[in-house]
From Swiss-Prot:
The lineage of its organism: Eukaryota, Sar, Alveolata, Ciliophora, Intramacronucleata. GO terms for molecular function: NADH dehydrogenase (ubiquinone) activity. This is NADH-ubiquinone oxidoreductase chain 1. It is a multi-pass membrane protein. Its EC number is 7.1.1.2. It is an enzyme of class 7 (translocase). It comes from Paramecium tetraurelia. The keyword Oxidoreductase does not apply. Belongs to the complex I subunit 1 family. Its main location: mitochondrion. It catalyses: a ubiquinone + NADH + 5 H(+)(in) = a ubiquinol + NAD(+) + 4 H(+)(out).
Length: 261
């Protein structure tokens, strides 16, 4: 179980790092600029250089901040993000544990991450961080209500909150054909949830103050930075599980469960 946990964390971290590089490449293409092109072949190892810089950078704790909670909040947020992937979203066997109420479990973890964001701004003792933390937390919690109502309707149709039930229900007919217009609204809400353009309300690229992470740097800033991309990747997987046939398309790769604990 310990080995599987370590492998899972490494695989997810590498996927998230690749997503960060892909997003930067796409943004540079849209904005007609070069983008990352120095480290590795055409900049493909840029995420390794960024990670090395962040992990070797020192951490300064503000004099008025609570040192314990200042360090604990990003650590808790990082733990919440990794806990997402211990659920059975990979497949029936490729998970550390399986719970009957997978959708509820994911929603609770998402709400907990929003609380971490709010408390992060509060314990920084910076008025800009406090305002940004409240703004981000209120936005995330309000969106969770909408997502909860939407997924509740879908779960009533499937008569279960389990990812396995969604896989069985969609063996013949995908739910995307029933909830196409609803999915378009969900995608807009997900953009709001993960603070992606044009809904980057909690933190805009044009602002000098980086929201609730204003006082953070180095390793602790990297945890929040990865947390946003964890949400982005997890919500993408969640949409695939709920609307696009679950893990039925991954059946050729399910032989890997023989090599897991």
């Amino acid at each position: 179980m310990l080995i599987y946990s370590i492998v899972l964390m490494l695989v997810v971290t590498l996927i998230i790092a690749s997503i960060t590089l892909l997003e930067r490449k796409l943004l540079s293409l849209v904005q007609r600029r070069v983008g990352p092109n120095f480290v590795g072949y055409k900049g493909r190892l840029q995420y390794l250089a960024d990670a090395l810089k962040l992990f070797l950078k020192g951490v300064a704790i503000p004099s008025g901040a609570n040192s314990f909670f200042f360090v604990a909040m990003p650590s808790l947020a990082g733990a919440v993000c990794y806990t997402f992937w211990m659920n059975s979203i990979w497949g029936p066997s490729l998970s550390m544990f399986d719970v009957e109420y997978n959708i509820v479990y994911a929603s609770l973890l998402s709400i907990l991450f929003g609380l971490c964001v709010m408390l992060t701004g509060y314990f920084s003792k910076n008025k800009y961080s406090v305002m940004a933390g409240l703004r981000a937390a209120i936005l995330m919690l309000n969106l969770e209500i909408f997502l909860g109502i939407v997924f509740l309707n879908v779960c009533f149709l499937v008569e279960s909150f389990s990812f396995a039930a969604f896989a069985v229900y969609q063996e013949i007919f995908w739910l995307i054909f029933l909830f196409f217009f609803l999915l378009s609204n969900i995608l807009l809400v997900f953009l709001l949830e993960v603070n992606r353009t044009p809904f980057d309300l909690a933190e805009a690229e044009s602002e000098l103050v980086t929201g609730y992470t204003t006082e953070y740097g180095g390793f602790y800033f990297a945890l929040f930075y990865l947390g946003e991309y964890f949400h982005l990747f997890f919500f993408s997987c969640l949409i695939s599980v709920v609307f696009f046939g679950s893990w039925e398309l991954l059946k050729p790769f399910l032989f890997l469960h023989n090599y897991t604990v």
